[in-house]
Each structure stands twice: as C-alpha cells, then as structure tokens.
Amino acid sequence: VDLDLAFGRGENSELLARVIREVPVRVELSGGITSRSAIEAGLAMGPERVNIATQALDDIDAVCEAIDAFGERVAVCLDVRGDQLAARGGRGEGGNVWEALRVLNEAGVARLIVTDVTRDGQMNGSNRDLLARVADRTPACIIASGGVNSLADIEALRALGIEGAIVGKALY
C-alpha cells in the first residue's frame, strides 16, 4: 500500500516497482489508485493485481470501464462505515455501499477488498456480518480487511466463503 499516494503526500512508485521485481511472491498494489492512468502505471510495475481505491467510486462509470478493460487484473476496494462508503482512507463519505455493489456486479467486478474502517487496526475481529451480507450480494471474490486478529477469525471468514484476508497489526 502506497500510503503517501493514498493520503496525497507524494508517491513511492520507484521503490514499489523494485519490491515487486525483487520479491519472489505475488504482489498486489494499493493506495491512491483512482484513475485509469494510475491503474495502467501500477500494472506496468508488474504486480498480479492493482486495487482501485474506494475514492475512485466517485466516478463509478470510470471504475466500470476499468473493470471491463482490465478484468481480473483489478480489484475494487470498498472501505465501509455502516452502509456508506468511506473514501479517502476512511476519512470521507461516499455513497451507499449496496448501490455501488449493484453497479459493480453489473460491470462484472471479479474481486472486492472489503474493509470496515471502524475496525481497521483495532484487532477486535473482522466484521463478519458485513462480509456475509456482501458475499450474499455478489458473485465476486472477497478479501476481508479491518480488524482481522487471529487464525480463528480467518477460519470463520473462510467458512463464509471469503477468499482471503488482509492481516496487518495482528502480525506484530
């Protein structure tokens, strides 16, 4: 995640491109990716996938065009607070998550990264209710984020059919 780009404090593309080239694992690129040119620049670095920021959903038609153009090479981040999108690193307000999800489904989104921003970094467990509701409303693969805190939490997510989980603070 390029947090500098996500928060408008610069970017780290050269460093990220080097990391992607040199590490022997599959890498996803996230953080401040809100335009087609940013998607193309990100994909040119060689990651497996580029994750489109929630903020990009302000222009959901452009996101749908990116889904059509890049398919499985892009995922869409849904940063959520209640039933609302929480763009700009969870600081801003967006539209209704369920309406956005409906439009993304129609566009054929392959993968979603769903983050409950109220749990992000709190290590109090993932919001399995939210994730189950999203899973019930989309055929897309789902990556859970926000509050994931234990192997038991990950196992519970797996039982919901969630494809993967982002574990951050709990690793420390």
Residue ranges and their predicted role:
Residues 40-43, 47-120:
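Conserved anion-binding
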Residues 2-3, 25-26, 50, 87-88, ...:
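Short, contiguous strand/loop micro-motifs
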Residues 1-14, 54, 113-124:
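Glycine-rich, proline-tolerant flexible connector loops at the mouths of alpha/beta enzymes
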Residues 8-9, 35, 59, 120-123, ...:
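Alpha-helix N-cap/loop-to-helix initiation residues
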Residues 7, 29-30, 53, 91, ...:
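Residue-level marker of alpha-helix boundaries and capping positions
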Residues 3-4, 32-34, 55, 79-83, ...:
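Active-site beta-loop-alpha junctions enriched in small/polar residues
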Residues 10-17, 60, 90-99, 124-133:
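Charged helix-capping and loop-helix junction motifs
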Residues 14-16, 22-50, 62, 129-165:
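Catalytic cores of alpha/beta
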